Amino acid sequence: MSHLNNALVEFFVIIHKFISSIITNPNYSYGVAIIFVTLIIKLILLPLNIKSMRSTIRINEIQPEIQKIQKKYKNDPQRLQQEQMKLYKEYNINPFGSCLPLLLQWPILIALYYVFNNIQGISGVSFLWVKDLASPDIVLAVLAGATQYYSGLLMNPKGDNTQAKTASNMNLSMSIMMIFISSRLKAALVIYWVTGNLIQMGQTILTKKLEQKHSANKDA
């Protein structure tokens, strides 16, 4: 983990040096550097994120079939698992595919927490309405929760069934928790989180459109 921490510190320093050569005012250069770092990290994770989103979208689409299987084999767990895996294979779905990007993002987030705690230059630096990137900002915290909520909303299954309601409640709970956590973190880290959520929303909308086009071509 220390190698990742040190690598991200060096990476951020390089990006900030490049940005500050164009934008000399530190009240803009640090914030823009954080956004650039987020874009680069998201770009690196893009193939995994798209694959993950496709799996999630397809699983949501076949929920009626999954529920039929669950109802039919509710007293036979082994057969239930076999039939579900058969269905996933038929639709080319990896049920665990959505977990990998999330598992990769947490070490990065923890490493960035280390980065912003060890880069002294951000102390006292403002960005947009944020007075100090090294201090918490309540507006950013609310934005973190709101973007987290809408990002999750785009991926949640539609309908009034139990799974849709559970996913909706979990999304709301996580978003409220995000506001609480972000209100205690340095604004620099929360800018990364908000920017990442906005990018995620764009990726989800684009991937959904591509999946709809793929389904339409398949049915034609």
From Swiss-Prot:
Keywords of the record: Cell membrane, Chaperone, Membrane, Protein transport, Transmembrane, Transmembrane helix, Transport
InterPro entries from the UniProt entry: YidC/ALB3/OXA1/COX18, YidC/Oxa/ALB_C, YidC_ALB_C
Topological relation to the membrane, as annotated: Multi-pass membrane protein
Location relative to the cell: Cell membrane
Any GO BP annotation: protein transport
A Pfam family reported for this protein in Swiss-Prot or TrEMBL: 60KD_IMP
Recorded superkingdom: Bacteria
Membrane-spanning intervals of the chain: 4-24, 30-50, 96-116, 172-194
GO molecular function: membrane insertase activity
Task performed by this protein: Required for the insertion and/or proper folding and/or complex formation of integral membrane proteins into the membrane. Involved in integration of membrane proteins that insert both dependently and independently of the Sec translocase complex, as well as at least some lipoproteins. Aids folding of multispanning membrane proteins.
Assembly with partners or alone: Interacts with the Sec translocase complex via SecD. Specifically interacts with transmembrane segments of nascent integral membrane proteins during membrane integration.
Stated family: Belongs to the OXA1/ALB3/YidC family. Type 1 subfamily.
Name of the molecule in the record: Membrane protein insertase YidC
Organism annotation: Clostridium tetani (strain Massachusetts / E88)
